[in-house]
Amino acid sequence: RRLIAASQPIRGTLVETYLRHRCIHDLHDVGALRYHPRCYHRPDDGGPTQTWAAMIASVTDLGGLITGAHRTWLDPSGTGKAPLETPRKAMGSLLGHAVRFGLAHDVMAAGEGIETMLSLRMALPCISMMAALSAAHLSAILFPETLRRLYIVRDID
């Protein structure tokens, strides 16, 4: 929660540049995404800690309570992810929860990646979307009782 509180909205930031470079231009209902200009990155091998600009995504439960955060460290040019061995990491309680775009209704779409779901959101702007962050988490995601139709979005990777 502190990381999310220390970050800022994405408008006019490197996150917006990164998403637009990914051809994601329609950025509505993206309050779950934030920007941190100097987010710590600790390598898995125990190397020195570095700071990079990052896209911070709030992971929330069905009630909107923040349960975790997902970080995508960005290249300073905004053209892609930072040149790190692991440019994405999540922390907190993720199982059953998701990064949410739009208000939950009776029809929703759920998939793994943030960028995948935002790309689909451009074609289907009225459907709420959820990014589970991994295939394992997608299989465990909790859905609202109001859900009547669910579209599962497949990543090609």
What do these predicted ranges mean?
Residues 1-55, 60-63:
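TOPRIM metal-binding catalytic domain and adjacent DNA-binding surface shared by DnaG-type primases
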Residues 1-2, 102, 152-153:
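A short, structure-level motif marking secondary-structure boundaries and short turns
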Residues 41-149:
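Phosphate-handling DNA/RNA-contact segment within nucleic-acid enzymes
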Residues 136-138, 154-157:
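Acidic, metal-coordinating catalytic cores used for nucleic-acid/nucleotide bond scission
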